[in-house]
Amino acid sequence: MNDSSSFPQAETIEQLRQNLATIRERIDQACLQAGRDPQEVRLLPVSKTHPAEYLRLAYAAGCRMLGENKIQEAYQKWQELEDLENLEWSVIGHLQTNKAKYVARFASEFHALDSLRLAQALDQRLTIEDRYLDVLVQINTSGEESKYGIDPEQAPELIAQLAQFTRLRVRGLMTLAMNSEDREAVRGCFVQLRELRDSLQGNAPAGMQLTELSMGMSGDFEIAIAEGATIVRIGQAIFGAREQPDSYYWPK
């Protein structure tokens, strides 16, 4: 549901600040229409493809957490921007088990947990680093084989097993809706994630709240908010259209 041509490149701090304010206003309005408190929804600016020096402008515009898909790109930016106080990183893309050490070293949260093996690798590396990590389990709600995430019916077993990993703080679920102009098909993905989260909450291990729903991007976040999103991942509507096609970051 994204027409990237409608997102002009933000080139100054003021343009970024204005885009952030515009998106926040749209989030607030979507919450009001849904009868929700706007404070329930967090805006996660997604900075993939943009170089570290450009992200200094985003920091100056008010960004204090940035989302990245590719771990090597994220890790390099973290190293280059370590001088920026209180800047946190959220890794939202698929992660290979052998790259868990990088996430454990610097990320504040990870939105794409999709296997017990990856959870174990993260927990081991976090123990070495003496850190903790907020994680969300990625669910494939579209049924598309090309998308990452576990099938919804696998979620109860994985959630139950995650309780053994003391360095992981399981916060909720994440999904990518299908890439479709059919708004109701997109909505169906979000409804499915919310209903799954609600069903899991009643049987979640002690201390596991499962309050977060990470769903919705630049083209569909208002639908996601109407269906219960607590984190919306916004890139192009803040920073401008990306040169790389979505297929570079998300499987088709």
Please identify what each model-predicted range represents.
Residues N2-G219, E227, F239-A241:
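Conserved alpha/beta-domain cores
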Residues A229-W250:
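Gly/Pro- and small hydrophobic-enriched strand-loop and loop-to-helix capping segments
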